[in-house]
Amino acid sequence: MDKLEDHDDNNLQSQIEEIEALSSIYGEEWCVIDEAARVFCIRISETQQPKWTVCLQIILPPDYPSSAPPIYQINAAWLRGQDRMTLSNSLEEIYVENAGESILYLWVEKIREFLTEKSQHSDGPDTCKTVMTEEGGHDCDEDDLPDISVLKLSSQSEQIFSPASDDEELPLIKHGESITDRRSTFQPHLSAVENPKQVQRVLNKLYENKKIASATHNIYAYRIYCQEKNSVLQDCEDDGETAAGGRLLHLLQILDVRNVLVVVSRWYGGILLGPDRFKHINNCARTILIQEGYADSTEETSKAGGKSKKPKSKKTK
């Protein structure tokens, strides 16, 4: 028993020393997600072309480094197919060649080397969001939508709304309580918005936060009402979590909330949640909408049967 405890203590000490070294070497690129659960991430970019970027999320098991590898996930929407397999194989080869040793620095530099090679042989990453960490879902139905015309974000539709000036004040961003299930964590963020430029400003501000930027997925949806045109501009983003953006937007439609952006960050913990992940995403969103006065309680909204007679912007206090 004492030997086992000594073994665990030695591993923990090695982990602490390795994390301290990586934090010192990489500075702001290194991010602690959950120190107690030993979850970390690092954002790795090609020096000359920062558009080539990968986020490496790492979970350190108790037996690392002596007898178990780190649990890792590579987050990059553009990295797919053979390229993803090649990079994963390279990381696994490093572990095999250095079994029992601390290898995170070697992994980071291998990824950086991979990005450098990619940048020299390609114009730029394909940012099509097709990478999934879980089994795919189905797009939401389009029933129960408000009886007004709907506009998708485009250069034409954006002109309907008053553009935000460059010196316009950044909308206030609210952060909700996190939900954790099987090592995956979900956290909602909300902001009142009146035009697409404000949406982008809020997203940019959120992504300045290292922890949010390193999330496996940042799913968002927004709805903006234009009274003159009796139209709603709305859009959503899965960020690789297939169908999640559409489901989140559908929730906003059912509640008929307007002039609001909701973002849900998910940090994937290595265990598949199946359909539960959609439940957590929408529960996070609903909770912060209720908290900020955009929606009624769950009991009241369920009585409405998905048909909201009065569109809801934020309620005055």
Swiss-Prot record:
Signal peptide: none annotated. It comes from Danio rerio. Belongs to the IMPACT family. This is Protein IMPACT. The keyword Glycosyltransferase does not apply. It comes from the Eukaryota. One of its GO terms (molecular function) is protein sequestering activity. The gene is impact. Residues 17-118 form the RWD domain. Interacts with GCN1; prevents the interaction of GCN1 with EIF2AK4/GCN2 and inhibits EIF2AK4/GCN2 kinase activity. Interaction with RPL39; this interaction occurs in a GCN1-independent manner. Associates with ribosomes; this interaction occurs in a GCN1-independent manner. Associates with actin; this interaction occurs in a GCN1-independent manner. The keyword Repressor applies. Gene3D superfamilies: Impact, N-terminal domain, Ubiquitin Conjugating Enzyme. Translational regulator that ensures constant high levels of translation upon a variety of stress conditions, such as amino acid starvation, UV-C irradiation, proteasome inhibitor treatment and glucose deprivation. Plays a role as a negative regulator of the EIF2AK4/GCN2 kinase activity; impairs GCN1-mediated EIF2AK4/GCN2 activation, and hence EIF2AK4/GCN2-mediated eIF-2-alpha phosphorylation and subsequent down-regulation of protein synthesis. Plays a role in differentiation of neuronal cells by stimulating neurite outgrowth. It is found in: Cytoplasm. InterPro entries: Impact, Impact_N, Impact_N_sf, Ribosomal_Su5_D2-typ_SF, RWD_dom, UBQ-conjugating_enzyme/RWD, UPF0029_Impact_CS. Residues 296-317 are annotated as: Disordered. SUPFAM superfamilies: Ribosomal protein S5 domain 2-like (SSF54211), UBC-like (SSF54495). Keywords: Cytoplasm, Differentiation, Neurogenesis, Repressor, Stress response, Translation regulation. One of its GO terms (biological process) is intracellular signal transduction.
